[in-house]
Swiss-Prot record:
GO terms for biological process: viral budding from nuclear membrane. This is Nuclear egress protein 2. The keyword Transmembrane applies. It is found in: Host nucleus inner membrane. The keyword Nucleotide-binding does not apply. Phosphorylated. InterPro entries: Herpesvirus_viron_egress-type (IPR007626). The chain crosses the membrane at residues 254-274.
Length: 276
């Protein structure tokens, strides 16, 4: 996506900060925190440690958009990655931490198509990667298209326990959402066809201009005469007629015609004189 012009700042640090700001916008405001490991990171050099973290206090009931956040991280990165979200019961709060790849020793596999509820006691940890999330979605036979089923974490913090429910939530009106997706796909195809058509037209204009500048006939145009002098436009029909009259035509030289006339006159004069 970098070649398409990502909506992040020009400097690498600004690019990563833009990603963190977007994550802050979609995470509930009651969850505190935001930034993780600091550094001049970019889509081609994402953080190897914690990218962001949020805290939920005791007594809070939050819904964390895990799938949206993980896909946002995956789309931002220009290098292969498998974003991972770790959830920990610290004993006084619940901690959400995001990584571009699962850290060494981090738990995984606790969430399956059959097991979507987890209870964390003090200092216990669980987590889920984007690859495992897609596997669960496929096993459940859910619609994998955007804006359809998306996983959220319902978090209930009641110390010393934290209850987590991993649930897929769909749009309120699935039929209308499918129509929007189909319309968006049709518009994208139409834009692509228009772009290709405009590129073809531009290429034809460039080729014609190149042939015109070199004096050679364009594609599909037969040469009907010598090329026009540089800097002059095509000759008009009346000008072409005048040029035809002005052009020298092949024939005997004038001196030869004069000699022949004199010889013919002398012969006639000799014949008449002989008769007299």
């Amino acid at each position: 996506m970098a070649g398409m012009g990502k909506p992040y700042g020009g400097r690498p640090g600004d690019a990563f900060e833009g990603l963190v700001q977007r994550i802050r916008l979609i995470v509930p405001a009651t969850l505190r925190g935001g930034g993780g490991e600091s550094g001049p990171y970019s889509p081609s050099n994402p953080p190897s440690r914690c990218a962001f973290q949020f805290h939920g206090q005791d007594g809070s009931d939050e819904a964390f958009p895990i799938e949206y956040v993980l896909r946002l991280m995956n789309d931002w990165a220009d290098v292969p990655c498998n974003p991972y979200l770790r959830v920990q019961n610290t004993g006084v709060s619940v901690l959400f931490q995001g990584f571009f790849n699962r850290p060494h020793g981090a738990p995984g596999g606790a969430i399956t198509a059959e097991q979507t509820n987890v209870i964390l006691h003090s200092t216990e940890t669980t987590g889920l990667s984007l690859g495992d999330l897609d596997d669960v979605k496929g096993r459940l036979g859910l619609d994998a298209r955007p804006m359809m089923a998306s996983m959220w974490i319902s978090c209930f913090v009641r110390m010393p326990r934290v209850q987590l429910a991993f649930r897929f939530m769909g749009p309120e009106d699935a039929v209308r959402t499918r129509r929007i997706l189909c319309r968006a796909a049709e518009q994208a195809l139409a834009r692509r066809r228009r772009s290709r058509r405009s590129q073809d037209d531009y290429g034809a204009v460039v080729v014609a201009a190149a042939h015109h500048s070199s004096g050679a006939p364009g594609p599909g145009v037969a040469a009907s005469g010598p090329p026009a002098p540089p800097g002059r436009g095509p000759a008009r029909p009346w000008h072409q007629a005048v040029q035809l009259f002005r052009a020298p035509r092949p024939g005997p030289p004038a001196l030869l015609l004069l000699a022949a006339g004199l010889f013919l006159g002398a012969a006639i004069w000799w014949a008449v004189g002989a008769r007299l």
